[in-house]
């Protein structure tokens, strides 16, 4: 358990978080290697099991083997649990075990829990964790119940399992699906492109899972009284709405000319929702225009919101960057939102995170392109999908060399643990300067 590591090694809470994710990934890979995990009853090569486990725990959805046709029922169940652990977070899952066992949680453990979900304070953290766990199970159950009639109609009783799996995968923004076959692998939700129930339920699960647990709490406590929400929830909801509607309009006019009416609108909406770390697709992405692929790369890098099941640099990071630019245009000293001033250190963190994701995205895509001899645009798409923990692909991931797949594994891992968590885990408070250096200016622009 992460708590034991914390006590014995005197690690910081951030180091516990990143080691916890690594431990679960390795354990999942070893389980997936077992013959019982595959349909053919063979030992799965370690690199394939590791890639799948990393993709599941990091709630990405990229795959080197088709989930529906390669993995057995046992293997699929393991993947679903890895997705659930990854979506909630390793520390949150460990907390659930502690709560269910009735064990007392120490102040150090509460502090780690606070950092794991970026809670503003330690007080009430156990109650909040309980709220998150109950809310997660309830939402996933409701999502599964809505999809059961559709999947049972198409797959019989197996449709119940498929509904549960896809509900967990959608809520956790993972993008794994069981719809592929030996003859038609990696199809995602393309066979349900015009099914309103599947489209709407999957979209709602993705959005709810991606807005963050603290936004849930605001909505739960204050219902639809937007003015009573915390500023973070206001920024998240406003940014999320803009990042759904504006790209949806773009996709509506840019693509899907072969569809008409409600089906075209549904496809455009789904394509606007899924790039922000979900990874499902209802159309062949390779057929999209270059402009649409560029838009999807941007959405994949932005991702979901803080303290959510989603990855990416986060909606708040993107919003703060825009607000900072707006403040500069207006010659304002302070960055403001909804009548509140935002601390300069938060803006600095947002800039750092955005730069980290951009560097990882570009370096990863460039390296894969050079090594594989593939078009840079396609490799950048896969890199953005990995570091944003999205799972959308142009179809090249299963064909990549092992070294390129290892690069994607690293990108998925770094994208899931988060920029600030990684920074704080590597650079402790001991590295802070005890004295401030003289101030000077430098010309920019």
Which stretches of residues belong to each language-model region?
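Membrane-proximal intracellular helices of multi-pass ion channels
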Residues: 1-445
């Amino acid at each position: 358990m992460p708590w034991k590591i914390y006590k014995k090694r005197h690690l910081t809470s951030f180091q516990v978080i990143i080691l916890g994710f690594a431990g679960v990934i390795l354990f999942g890979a070893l389980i997936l290697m077992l013959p019982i995990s595959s349909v053919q009853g063979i030992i799965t090569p370690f690199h394939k099991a590791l890639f799948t486990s990393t993709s599941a725990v990091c709630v990405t959805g990229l795959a080197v083997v088709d989930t529906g046709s390669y993995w057995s029922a046992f293997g699929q169940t393991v993947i679903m649990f890895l997705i659930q652990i990854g979506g909630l977070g390793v520390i949150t899952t460990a907390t659930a075990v502690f709560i269910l066992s009735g064990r007392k949680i120490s102040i150090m453990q509460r502090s780690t829990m606070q950092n794991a979900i970026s809670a503003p304070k330690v007080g009430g953290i156990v109650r909040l964790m309980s709220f998150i766990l109950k809310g997660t199970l309830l939402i996933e159950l409701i999502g599964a119940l809505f999809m059961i009639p559709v999947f049972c109609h198409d797959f019989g009783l197996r449709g119940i399992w498929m509904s549960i799996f896809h509900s967990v995968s959608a809520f956790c923004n993972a993008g794994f699906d069981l719809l592929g076959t030996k003859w038609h692998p990696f199809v995602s939700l393309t066979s349900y492109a015009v099914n309103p129930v599947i489209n709407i339920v999957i979209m709602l699960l993705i959005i709810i899972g991606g807005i963050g647990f603290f936004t849930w709490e605001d909505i739960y406590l204050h219902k639809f009284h937007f003015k009573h929400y915390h500023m973070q929830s206001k920024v998240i909801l406003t940014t999320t709405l803009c990042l759904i509607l504006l790209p949806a309009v773009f996709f509506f006019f840019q693509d899907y000319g072969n569809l008409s009416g409600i089906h075209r609108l549904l496809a455009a909406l789904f394509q606007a929702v899924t790039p922000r770390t979900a990874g499902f697709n209802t159309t062949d992405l390779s057929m999209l225009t270059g402009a649409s692929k560029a838009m999807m790369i941007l959405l994949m890098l932005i991702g979901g919101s803080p303290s959510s099941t989603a990855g990416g640099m986060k909606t708040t990071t993107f919003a703060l960057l825009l607000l900072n630019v707006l403040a500069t245009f207006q010659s304002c000293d302070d960055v403001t939102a909804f009548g509140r001033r935002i601390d300069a250190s938060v803006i600095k963190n947002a800039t750092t995170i955005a730069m980290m994701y951009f560097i990882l995205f570009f370096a990863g895509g460039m390296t894969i392109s050079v090594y594989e001899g593939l078009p840079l645009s396609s490799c950048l798409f896969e890199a953005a999908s990995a570091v944003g923990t999205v799972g959308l692909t142009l179809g090249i991931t299963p064909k990549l060399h092992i070294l390129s797949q290892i690069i994607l594994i690293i990108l998925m891992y770094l994208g899931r643990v988060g920029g600030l968590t990684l920074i704080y885990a590597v650079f402790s408070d001991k590295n802070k300067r005890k004295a401030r250096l003289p101030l000077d200016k430098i010309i920019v622009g």
